[in-house]
Amino acid sequence: MVFRRFVEVGRVAYVSFGPHAGKLVAIVDVIDQNRALVDGPCTQVRRQAMPFKCMQLTDFILKFPHSAHQKYVRQAWQKADINTKWAATRWAKKIEARERKAKMTDFDRFKVMKAKKMRNRIIKNEVKKLQKAALLKASPKKAPGTKGTAAAAAAAAAAKVPAKKITAASKKAPAQKVPAQKATGQKAAPAPKAQKGQKAPAQKAPAPKASGKKA
C-alpha cells in the first residue's frame, strides 16, 4: 500500500509516551525536522512543542489554517468527530485490550482460561456437526441405505455367476461340435474310398462277360 501518513498541518497524532501518553493531538505547525507545535483542545493537551519521536501519525486530518487559534482547532475537531472515530479503530481497541489485560488479577485470568476452554469445546462440537452434515450431503445414496446397496450388489453377483456359466457352456458347445464335425469328416473320407473299392468291382464286371463268351 502507498504510504499516506505524512507530517502536515492538521494531521492528528497519537502520543505514545511522555506526560501525555495515550492522548490525541493535532499538528498546528512544524517547527523543524524534529519537533512540531501540537494542540489537543478536546483531549486536555495544551498547545506546546512536542518531538516527533513521541507521536504516531494517524489517518485523520483536520482542516484549519496554518497556526490557527485553539478555537478553530476545537471546532474542526468536533466537526470531524475525531474521538468517536478513534474509538472505533482497531488501533484504539488493541490499546484498550492491552490496558485491560494489564489490570487483570489471577482470578480474572482463571475465569478467562475457563471461558476459552468452553468456547473451544463448543466450536469443536459445531465443526464436527458441520462435517457430518457435509458428508451426508455429499453421499446421500450411500449413507441411508448401505444394507440395500449391499443386498443389491450380492444379488447382482449371484445373477452374474450363472450367466458366466451359461456363456462358458455355450462357448464350449461349439468347441465340442467342431471335433464332432471333424470326426464325421474323417468318417466321410473313407466313404469315397469305399466307393473307389466299389468302382474296382465295377471295372471287374467284364470278367463275367468274358465268362459269358466262354460259355
UniProtKB/Swiss-Prot annotation:
Residues 171-190 are annotated as: 4 X 5 AA tandem repeats of Q-K-A-[PAS]-X. Keywords: Acetylation, Cytoplasm, Isopeptide bond, Phosphoprotein, Repeat, Ribonucleoprotein, Ribosomal protein, Ubl conjugation. Residues 161-215 are annotated as: Disordered. The modification N6-acetyllysine is found at residues 79, 85. It is found in: Cytoplasm. GO terms for biological process: cytoplasmic translation; ribosomal large subunit biogenesis; rRNA processing; translation. Residues 193-198 are annotated as: 2 X 3 AA tandem repeats of K-[GA]-Q. Sequence repeats lie at residues 171-175, 176-180, 181-185, 186-190, 193-195, 196-198. The modification N6-succinyllysine is found at residues 85, 204. GO terms for molecular function: cadherin binding; RNA binding; structural constituent of ribosome. The modification Phosphoserine is found at residue 139. CDD domains: eL14. The keyword Metal-binding does not apply. Component of the large ribosomal subunit. This is Large ribosomal subunit protein eL14.
